[in-house]
């Protein structure tokens, strides 16, 4: 492992505000675990023939497949292929964090590069074949594996307890998530969630056994094939296909049910994903409850703007009339959500903006979890930091008390986690007024408009993941955006601050922002610690300014009261479109 390469541990720690309160020594100890002399001894070395992994080449007749990963390379979307059909039971494979591995295996399996990739590109690394070969051996030792697998509770986990050169020595256990199934809502109690909109039409229900897993796209989203009797009415006649998207829970069921209620009660809009086609149920073992585990949506064949924008720009097929059309459609969708939907949408990012077959925008994902820091408004970023620090158990009591006070001042009383689970959405957004939420959405829209007109995948290169097309220019630099639209984007993104980031990722390496010099891990951590300390101080000043503004004006404080409304953004885009 090169000392100037990004690692999962560094990415995890450096992207958390907790890094502001950690020292380099403790971090180095953490990432160097297992790097002591025994790991280099001949009897442990991977150069020793007896320690070599039997094979890391793809199997000629694979019995498992891997569709992607998440959680910095510790959670894999795996599925057996030696029986069919496979139901989308959300059973994923989990491995230990790399800090618990023998050092030689970290390098051999390529985890310090592989963790940057979340899609099928993970299969280009040895860790993918290692996981697949291990699952193949493990499943072959279990009698009637199919029956055992299909009887598992929804969302169960296949857990590797250790990582060894010899895959037969890996201890694997199954975590049966009975507690998760107990949290699921029954189909009979679901209508009570729609009392505020009694006219909502419920889609038909289908048992999960009718779905055949085709591909796991993300933690909570899969492409599935609907298996139905020939006599059933063909509700897919319009699309001529039985392929649909299965949306399920990734952790807390509350987010899933909140999204489902929004999609069922919000009036349709041409640029918002339509209401679910089915509600998917599963009979759970305890109490014989028929529980809601997800819903199906139409499957859009096109990619998201995250990949389409840079691809078309590179190919020379990204045209201004398409860009302005997409910008108008996204803004129109946000207005619809404001006026006829839940009132706000905090998940606005490029991978949640898909294209239909007609090349029109379709907005997806209404869990209301929030977005990456690169799209989040400054105020939300700062409040997210406060929430994270209050929840972290490793911090000094004095530090936690300081941020508990900030939490209570700017968010509200600290509520027990179990009670908070009943609230749906991102906590910092929940404490905002209606007008403030619109201003925050306009900020995110401004960042997204910049990406659309610059033809890039994101506002910046991320430390913890690599896009299929890495951004070649970073916000707020303008190169391709029409001059007439630049003032609009600047007014939308008021409050953006240039962080004095000393380090960034270039490929696998950490380099200095100004000189391009490669950083070793200890130096990089010191830089991230400094960055986070400065970010937290900026946050305190920002929130104080907001409070002072509120006290003097008697209104909800805002550092930027002249942020344009969604109506104004739409008007500006329409007027520009008339000039084309």
List each model region and its residues:
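Activation segment signature within eukaryotic-like protein kinase domains
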Residues: 326-327
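Catalytic-loop of the protein kinase fold
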Residues: 337-356
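Regulatory activation segment
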Residues: 376-383
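Conserved structural core of kinase catalytic domains
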Residues: 253-254, 273-322
């Amino acid at each position: 492992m090169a000392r100037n390469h990004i690692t999962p541990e560094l990415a995890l720690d450096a992207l958390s505000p907790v890094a502001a309160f950690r020292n380099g020594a403790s971090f180095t100890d953490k990432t160097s675990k297992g790097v002591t002399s025994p790991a280099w001894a001949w009897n442990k070395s991977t150069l020793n023939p007896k320690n070599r992994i039997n094979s890391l080449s793809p199997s000629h007749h694979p019995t498992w497949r891997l569709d992607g990963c998440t959680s910095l390379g510790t959670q894999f979307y795996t599925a057996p292929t030696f029986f069919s059909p496979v139901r989308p039971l959300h059973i994923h494979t989990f491995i230990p964090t790399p800090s618990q591995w023998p050092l030689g295996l970290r390098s051999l399996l390529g985890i310090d590069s592989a963790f940057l990739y979340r899609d099928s590109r993970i299969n280009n690394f040895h860790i993918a074949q290692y996981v697949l070969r291990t699952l193949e051996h493990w499943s072959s030792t279990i009698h009637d594996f199919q029956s055992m697998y299909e009887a598992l509770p929804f969302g169960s986990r296949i857990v590797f307890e250790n990582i060894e050169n010899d895959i037969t020595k890996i201890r694997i256990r199954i975590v049966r998530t009975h507690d998760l199934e107990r949290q699921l809502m029954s189909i009979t109690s679901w209508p009570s969630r729609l009392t505020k909109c009694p006219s909502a039409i419920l889609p038909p229900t289908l048992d999960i056994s009718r779905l055949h897993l085709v591909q796991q796209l993300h933690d909570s989203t899969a492409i599935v094939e609907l298996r139905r009797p020939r006599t059933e009415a063909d509700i897919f006649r319009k699309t001529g296909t039985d392929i649909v998207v299965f949306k399920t829970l990734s952790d807390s069921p509350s987010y899933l049910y909140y999204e489902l209620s929004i999609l069922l009660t919000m009036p349709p809009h041409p640029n918002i994903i339509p209401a679910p086609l089915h509600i998917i149920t599963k009979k759970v073992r305890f109490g014989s409850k028929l529980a809601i585990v997800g819903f199906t949506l139409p499957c859009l064949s096109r990619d998201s703007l995250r990949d389409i924008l840079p691809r078309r720009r590179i190919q020379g097929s990204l045209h201004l009339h398409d860009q302005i059309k997409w910008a108008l459609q996204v803004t129109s969708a946000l207005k619809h959500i404001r006026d006829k939907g839940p009132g706000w949408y905090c998940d606005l990012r490029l991978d949640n903006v898909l294209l239909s077959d007609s090349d029109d925008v379709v907005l997806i994902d209404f869990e209301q979890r929030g977005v990456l820091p690169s799209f989040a408004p400054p105020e939300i970023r700062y409040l997210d930091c406060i929430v994270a620090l209050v929840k972290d158990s490793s911090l000094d009591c004095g530090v936690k008390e300081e941020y508990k006070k900030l939490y209570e001042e700017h968010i509200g009383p600290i509520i027990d986690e179990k009670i908070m689970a009943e609230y749906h959405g991102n906590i910092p957004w929940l404490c905002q007024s209606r007008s403030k939420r619109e201003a925050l959405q306009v900020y995110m829209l401004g960042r997204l408009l910049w990406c659309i007109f610059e033809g890039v995948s994101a506002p910046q290169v991320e430390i913890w993941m690599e896009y299929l097309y890495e951004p070649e220019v970073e916000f707020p630099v303008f190169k391709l955006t029409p001059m007439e639209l630049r003032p609009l984007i600047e007014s939308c993104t008021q409050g953006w601050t240039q962080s004095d980031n000393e380090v960034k990722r270039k490929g696998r390496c950490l380099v200095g922002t100004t000189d391009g010099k490669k950083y070793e891990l200890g130096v990089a951590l010191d830089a991230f610690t400094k960055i986070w300390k400065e970010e937290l101080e900026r946050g305190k000043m920002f929130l104080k300014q907001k409070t002072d503004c509120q006290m003097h004006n008697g209104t909800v404080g805002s550092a930027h009261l002249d942020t344009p409304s969604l109506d104004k953004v739409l008007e500006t885009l329409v007027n520009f479109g008339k000039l084309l």
